[in-house]
């Protein structure tokens, strides 16, 4: 997400979030000088929400709908600042970058190290794998290097086909439409992106060994 970007639209609120906000305002009016125990307050709100009828909840659901419309409208007009990660979304259909010979070696030997040393941290595991890899002879490394070369060759063919397909589809569509509506799936995309980044970072750490 665009951390620190003051122009980024405020996130949309759920019907329950509006309900909690209303409860908080009511509590402040009744007890202006008393502090709120957040955990206890949240529990009470949750219990109260469960006992409410659909008719009582509809007021908050309407508020959530109008806030969602506001958010979608603002996101369509929102332009992320240059360098913002969300400006270049990863296409889930894009071919995945091939692993290196070392990464293939790690994938094969990591489970063994984890079973032998269950308390070992990720960093220490990566370090141990790096040491093991450096101790391998050129002959022992060869199967991994051959497999990595084949995967790289396949990736290069796949990415060329993917890019060619992207260009032809862009030509058919003509001038691009605003893609702000895609932002609805932003939290899920972020999680995927973070997972992929964790993998990439681990691979980079291992390559440095």
From Swiss-Prot:
<keyword id="KW-0963">Cytoplasm</keyword>
<feature type="modified residue" description="Phosphoserine">
    <location>
        <position position="35"/>
    </location>
</feature>
<dbReference type="GO" id="GO:0032496">
    <property type="term" value="P:response to lipopolysaccharide"/>
</dbReference>
<dbReference type="GO" id="GO:0019904">
    <property type="term" value="F:protein domain specific binding"/>
</dbReference>
<feature type="region of interest" description="Required for chemotactic activity">
    <location>
        <begin position="165"/>
        <end position="180"/>
    </location>
</feature>
<keyword id="KW-0391">Immunity</keyword>
<dbReference type="GO" id="GO:0072091">
    <property type="term" value="P:regulation of stem cell proliferation"/>
</dbReference>
<dbReference type="GO" id="GO:0005737">
    <property type="term" value="C:cytoplasm"/>
</dbReference>
<feature type="modified residue" description="N6-acetyllysine">
    <location>
        <position position="114"/>
    </location>
</feature>
<dbReference type="GO" id="GO:0044378">
    <property type="term" value="F:non-sequence-specific DNA binding, bending"/>
</dbReference>
<keyword id="KW-0964">Secreted</keyword>
<dbReference type="GO" id="GO:0000400">
    <property type="term" value="F:four-way junction DNA binding"/>
</dbReference>
<feature type="modified residue" description="N6-acetyllysine">
    <location>
        <position position="3"/>
    </location>
</feature>
<feature type="compositionally biased region" description="Basic and acidic residues">
    <location>
        <begin position="137"/>
        <end position="150"/>
    </location>
</feature>
<feature type="compositionally biased region" description="Basic and acidic residues">
    <location>
        <begin position="107"/>
        <end position="117"/>
    </location>
</feature>
<dbReference type="GO" id="GO:0045893">
    <property type="term" value="P:positive regulation of DNA-templated transcription"/>
</dbReference>
<keyword id="KW-0399">Innate immunity</keyword>
<dbReference type="GO" id="GO:0050786">
    <property type="term" value="F:RAGE receptor binding"/>
</dbReference>
<feature type="modified residue" description="N6-acetyllysine">
    <location>
        <position position="43"/>
    </location>
</feature>
<keyword id="KW-0539">Nucleus</keyword>
<feature type="DNA-binding region" description="HMG box 2">
    <location>
        <begin position="95"/>
        <end position="163"/>
    </location>
</feature>
<dbReference type="GO" id="GO:0045654">
    <property type="term" value="P:positive regulation of megakaryocyte differentiation"/>
</dbReference>
<comment type="similarity">
    <text>Belongs to the HMGB family.</text>
</comment>
<dbReference type="GO" id="GO:1902042">
    <property type="term" value="P:negative regulation of extrinsic apoptotic signaling pathway via death domain receptors"/>
</dbReference>
<dbReference type="GO" id="GO:0007289">
    <property type="term" value="P:spermatid nucleus differentiation"/>
</dbReference>
<feature type="modified residue" description="Cysteine sulfonic acid (-SO3H); alternate">
    <location>
        <position position="45"/>
    </location>
</feature>
<dbReference type="GO" id="GO:0140297">
    <property type="term" value="F:DNA-binding transcription factor binding"/>
</dbReference>
<keyword id="KW-0804">Transcription</keyword>
<dbReference type="GO" id="GO:0008301">
    <property type="term" value="F:DNA binding, bending"/>
</dbReference>
<keyword id="KW-0395">Inflammatory response</keyword>
<dbReference type="GO" id="GO:0003690">
    <property type="term" value="F:double-stranded DNA binding"/>
</dbReference>
<dbReference type="GO" id="GO:0033151">
    <property type="term" value="P:V(D)J recombination"/>
</dbReference>
<dbReference type="GO" id="GO:0006357">
    <property type="term" value="P:regulation of transcription by RNA polymerase II"/>
</dbReference>
<feature type="compositionally biased region" description="Basic and acidic residues">
    <location>
        <begin position="52"/>
        <end position="76"/>
    </location>
</feature>
<dbReference type="GO" id="GO:0006325">
    <property type="term" value="P:chromatin organization"/>
</dbReference>
<feature type="compositionally biased region" description="Acidic residues">
    <location>
        <begin position="187"/>
        <end position="209"/>
    </location>
</feature>
<dbReference type="InterPro" id="IPR009071">
    <property type="entry name" value="HMG_box_dom"/>
</dbReference>
<feature type="modified residue" description="Cysteine sulfonic acid (-SO3H); alternate">
    <location>
        <position position="23"/>
    </location>
</feature>
<dbReference type="GO" id="GO:0008625">
    <property type="term" value="P:extrinsic apoptotic signaling pathway via death domain receptors"/>
</dbReference>
<keyword id="KW-0677">Repeat</keyword>
<dbReference type="GO" id="GO:0048545">
    <property type="term" value="P:response to steroid hormone"/>
</dbReference>
<keyword id="KW-0233">DNA recombination</keyword>
């Amino acid at each position: 997400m665009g951390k620190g970007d003051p122009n980024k639209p405020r996130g949309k609120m759920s019907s329950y979030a509006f309900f909690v906000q209303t409860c908080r305002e009511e509590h402040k009016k009744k007890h202006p000088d008393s502090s709120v125990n957040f955990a206890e307050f949240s529990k009470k709100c949750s219990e109260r929400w469960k006992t409410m009828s659909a008719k009582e909840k509809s007021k908050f659901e309407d508020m959530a709908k109008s806030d969602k419309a506001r958010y979608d409208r603002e996101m369509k007009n929102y332009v992320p600042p240059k360098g913002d990660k969300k400006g270049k979304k990863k296409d889930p259909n894009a071919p995945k970058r091939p692993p290196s010979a070392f990464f293939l070696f790690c994938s094969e030997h990591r489970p063994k190290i984890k079973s032998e040393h269950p308390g070992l941290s990720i960093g220490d595991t990566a370090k141990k794998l790096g040491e093991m890899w450096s101790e391998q002879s050129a002959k022992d490394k060869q199967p991994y290097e051959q497999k990595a070369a084949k995967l790289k060759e396949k990736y290069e063919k796949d990415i060329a086909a993917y890019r060619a397909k992207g260009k032809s589809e862009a030509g058919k569509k003509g001038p691009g439409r605003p893609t702000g509506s895609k932002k609805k799936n932003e939290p899920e995309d972020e999680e995927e992106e973070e997972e992929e980044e964790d993998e990439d970072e681990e691979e980079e750490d291992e390559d440095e060994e």
